[in-house]
């Protein structure tokens, strides 16, 4: 499954699909980076996807464009978890590293808008 991890980690955007309690799928385009054997995503703590992951950690990932239109590749299933402060800081670094100046500027303005507690990292394991 390492090849799937590498393939997804190389994509500029991923369509992260989370699931409501009703089972309805909710797709969201996200930035993602590899951190060890997982993919990490950065999000506002109060975002719907974070709430849905708390209730059901099953997610799906596929390559997409900035608007969330699937571009290529197979959909991959995984399990997501909400990271602690240390994991969230590592996620910010991984995202900023992958996305360069755009990632760094985005992180900077996010801190200005609400500080580091406003956002949270999500780790996604696609090996199970």
What are these regions (language model features)?
Residues 1-6, 38-49:
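Short charge-dense sequence patches
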């Amino acid at each position: 499954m390492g090849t799937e991890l590498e393939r997804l980690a190389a994509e500029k955007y991923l369509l992260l699909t989370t699931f409501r309690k009703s089972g309805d799928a909710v797709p969201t385009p996200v930035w993602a980076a590899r951190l060890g054997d997982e993919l990490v995503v950065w999000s506002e703590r109060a975002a719907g996807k974070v709430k849905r992951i708390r209730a059901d950690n099953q997610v799906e990932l596929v390559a997409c464009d900035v608007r969330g239109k699937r571009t290529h590749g197979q959909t991959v299933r995984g399990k997501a978890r909400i990271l602690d402060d240390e994991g969230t800081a590592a996620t910010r670094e991984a995202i900023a590293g992958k996305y360069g100046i755009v990632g760094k500027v985005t992180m900077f303005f996010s801190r200005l808008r609400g500080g580091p507690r406003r956002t949270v990292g999500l780790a996604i394991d696609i090996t199970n």
